[in-house]
Amino acid sequence: MFSRRIQVLSPFLKHFVNRNARMMATEANISATSANPQSQGENLKTFEIYRWNPEKPEVKPKLQKYTVDLTKCGPMVLDALIKIKNEQDPTLTFRRSCREGICGSCAMNINGSNTLACICNIKKDNKPTKIYPLPHCFIVKDLVPDLTYFYKQYKSIEPWLQNDNIPKDKEFYQSRADRAKLDGLYECILCACCSTSCPSYWWNSEEYLGPAVLMQAYRWIIDSRDQATAKRLDVMQNSMSVYRCHTIMNCARTCPKGLNPGLAIAKVKALMATA
């Protein structure tokens, strides 16, 4: 049991270690700049950020340029966004919370790829960093996408344990082998990076569940403690919910957690074929 706890806790410990390393790197960077005043102001980076305000519908969306001195900024894109909002433009709107790649709030499109701003390093080159909201979503404002329908689809798969045979000690036991089957699935943080990078989801988002939701569906389908496997598969037995996946695999390439939704979808298809 102790070894299992260590395995469960290790991802969280890893995040704290990474956070401390980033903080130390930032402090070292600022200290080096203070020790060498001539270097101040020489490491400027341009950010081109998508702006749109629903309160001003007559103004078309645009890319607005901001310049940040990287010697006085943390190493991540989110650090730059926070610095811009705090020091240059308080109207800039974006989501963020944990700053550790855990919550998924700061998902956006950076230089053409969906990712989390809090774990995306600022490129040390002369090219501007272009930042857009997640693609093919309605926009609330600036970098904030409307994920209402995404979460509605997630709710539709009933992502909770369904088992009416509650044990006397009120705990559902699971072997280590069965628990290991959930690795690579439960870590999904529902940031929507994968689904909004999928062309099939762009074209069929009203009916196709998309990579993130389907991976979560598979996570519950194979959970040895769950008794609703047949029902879960039956709900998706149509031409759209699952089979609009054409294995383009953008989902696996863009996942900031290194997961493989495409593989999970393939396994769902295999189960449906034999159900």
From Swiss-Prot:
Transit peptide: 1-24
Pathway assigned in UniProt: Carbohydrate metabolism; tricarboxylic acid cycle; fumarate from succinate (eukaryal route): step 1/1
Entry GO CC: cytoplasm; mitochondrial inner membrane; mitochondrial membrane; respiratory chain complex II (succinate dehydrogenase)
Annotated residues for binding of [2Fe-2S] cluster: C98, C103, C106, C118
Gene name for this UniProt entry: sdh2
InterPro entries linked: 2Fe-2S_ferredoxin-like_sf (IPR036010), 2Fe-2S_ferredoxin-type (IPR001041), 2Fe2S_fd_BS (IPR006058), 4Fe4S_Fe-S-bd (IPR017896), 4Fe4S_Fe_S_CS (IPR017900), Beta-grasp_dom_sf (IPR012675), Helical_ferredxn (IPR009051), SDH/FRD_Iron-Sulfur (IPR050573)
List of residues binding a ubiquinone: W203
Comment on bound cofactor: Binds 1 [2Fe-2S] cluster.
Protein name: Succinate dehydrogenase [ubiquinone] iron-sulfur subunit, mitochondrial
